[in-house]
């Protein structure tokens, strides 16, 4: 029997061509390969969701599920108490989303009823209160999601306080509003990670 760590990787001495070949083959065998048809379907789904493929694939790999809804904070939607109507550029972005739920979270003093008047949203609910406890945030988000599983929902957030909702709601990912509504979405944030 060998010593502890005897199979911990290649030795530090210069490897022969055969050893390099074996290690490359072993590493390549660890990476999953998807059939071209599956990749095409996932690229098409990412397009329906308005996400780049890298972001969609990352969320899909992390959760093991497809995205069924987006959760938008009223700040991310630029809906304010004086002007609850979503700006035209944001409304067009929401209208372009296909085969996915669009749920708004109204932050006080904006009411969920005012936010729900936007036809681009499928539903609107009150957002967790500012500085609410983790438990209260989780309960509020669970009420907003209804029967939707949290790990299939992506949060679009504007502020640091809103990003905390991702962990509280056990959501799939959190994307910055500027990236989602701006030039394009980059990489998704891990909901277990607090920093951006």
Positions of predicted regions on the chain:
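Amphipathic alpha-helical packing elements
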Residues: 5, 16-73
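Structural motif
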Residues: 105-111, 129-136, 155-160
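Extended, compositionally biased intrinsically disordered regions
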Residues: 1-11, 192-196
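Flexible, charged surface loops at secondary-structure boundaries
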Residues: 95-100, 115, 142-151
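Long, compositionally biased
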Residues: 71-103
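A short acidic (Asp/Glu
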Residues: 56, 68-70, 115-117, 163-168
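A short, well-structured beta->alpha microelement
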Residues: 125-145
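Extended, charged low-complexity segments
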Residues: 141-196
């Amino acid at each position: 029997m060998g010593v502890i760590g005897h199979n911990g990787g290649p030795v530090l001495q210069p490897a022969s061509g055969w050893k390099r070949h074996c290690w490359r083959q072993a590493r390549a065998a660890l990476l999953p390969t998807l059939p071209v048809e599956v990749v095409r379907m996932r690229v098409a789904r990412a397009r329906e969701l308005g996400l780049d493929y890298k972001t969609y694939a990352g969320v899909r790999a992390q959760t093991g599920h497809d995205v069924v809804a987006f959760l938008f904070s009223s700040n991310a939607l630029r809906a304010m108490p004086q002007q609850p109507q979503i700006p035209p550029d944001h409304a067009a972005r929401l209208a372009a989303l296909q085969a996915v739920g669009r749920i708004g979270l109204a932050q006080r003093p904006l009411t969920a009823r005012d936010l729900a008047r936007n036809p681009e949203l499928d539903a609107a609910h009150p957002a967790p209160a500012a500085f609410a406890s983790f438990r209260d945030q989780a309960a509020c988000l669970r009420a907003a999601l209804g029967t939707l599983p949290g790990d299939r929902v992506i949060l679009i957030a504007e502020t640091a306080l809103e990003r905390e909702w991702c962990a509280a709601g056990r959501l799939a990912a959190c994307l910055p509003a500027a990236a989602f509504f701006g030039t394009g979405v980059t990489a998704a944030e891990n909901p277990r990670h607090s920093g951006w």
